[in-house]
Amino acid sequence: MQPKFNNQAKQDKLVLTGKILEIIHGDKFRVLLENNVEVDAHLAGKMRMRRLRILPGDLVEVEFSPYDLKLGRIIGRK
């Protein structure tokens, strides 16, 4: 019998659009979200593997966990 995994954690993610304000260190960035809130975000693993370059002024998609809305993951560039 195969165990059933709950995919609820993936559905609880919150995705917002933001603009990169500054590069803090390596893969950490300060992002201004569309609702005028500044948060810190780091690159997601797939973006790090693809070695995509993110510069100040770029529009990005930021994913948040419902448990910590101050730290996000950059999952894509627009």
From Swiss-Prot:
SUPFAM superfamilies found in the cross-reference section: Nucleic acid-binding proteins
CDD domains per the UniProt record, alphabetical: S1_IF1
Keywords, alphabetical: Cytoplasm, Initiation factor, Protein biosynthesis, RNA-binding, rRNA-binding
Gene3D superfamilies: Nucleic acid-binding proteins
Source organism superkingdom: Bacteria
S1-like domain location: 4-78
Subcellular location: Cytoplasm
A GO cellular-component term linked to this record: cytosol
GO molecular function: ribosome binding; rRNA binding; translation initiation factor activity
Chief subcellular location: cytoplasm
Entries under PANTHER family matching the protein: TRANSLATION INITIATION FACTOR IF-1, CHLOROPLASTIC (PTHR33370:SF1)
Subunit structure of this chain's protein: Component of the 30S ribosomal translation pre-initiation complex which assembles on the 30S ribosome in the order IF-2 and IF-3, IF-1 and N-formylmethionyl-tRNA(fMet); mRNA recruitment can occur at any time during PIC assembly.
Recorded family membership: Belongs to the IF-1 family.
Function: One of the essential components for the initiation of protein synthesis. Stabilizes the binding of IF-2 and IF-3 on the 30S subunit to which N-formylmethionyl-tRNA(fMet) subsequently binds. Helps modulate mRNA selection, yielding the 30S pre-initiation complex (PIC). Upon addition of the 50S ribosomal subunit IF-1, IF-2 and IF-3 are released leaving the mature 70S translation initiation complex.
Name of the protein described by the UniProt record: Translation initiation factor IF-1
Gene for this chain: infA
